[in-house]
Swiss-Prot record:
Job of this protein: Probably a connector protein for RcsB/C regulation of biofilm formation, providing additional signal input into the two-component signaling pathway. May serve to stimulate biofilm maturation, probably via the Rcs phosphorelay. Mild overexpression at 16 degrees Celsius increases the production of colanic acid, an exopolysaccharide and matrix component, and reduces adhesive curli fimbriae expression. Both of these effects require RcsB.
Upregulation: Induced by 5-fluorouracil. Strongly induced at 16 degrees Celsius. Expression is dependent on RpoS, repressed by YcgE. At 16 degrees Celsius with blue light irradiation, expression of this operon is absolutely dependent on YcgF for relief from YcgE repression. Part of the ycgZ-ymgA-ariR-ymgC operon.
Protein name (record): Probable two-component-system connector protein YmgA
Annotated segments matching region Disordered: 63-90
Record field: compositional bias (Polar residues): 63-80
BP GO annotations: negative regulation of single-species biofilm formation
Domain of life: Bacteria
Species of provenance: Escherichia coli (strain K12)
Amino acid sequence: MKTSDNERIKYEITGQAVLQILRMKINFSLQTLIKQLLVMKSAEEDAFRRDLIDSIIRDFSNSDSGGPNRRTATADNKSMFNGKKINRIH
């Protein structure tokens, strides 16, 4: 399979994980996304897709450069992109 096909499938899987988290109406964080991907991996029957999910988890785990003192999802309401406060809608 082409790399572009793999990337497309990885985006699809990531999107499915994000949508599932949003449906559960829980706070979204990188940790939550990784946990949802692990749940999806355990339920996946296709070995190729399991490998892709592993790859996605590694990508997200490596992008979390916070080191051992990582903030938890509930530590603050600041965007990881610009540090501005996020207004939460409940």
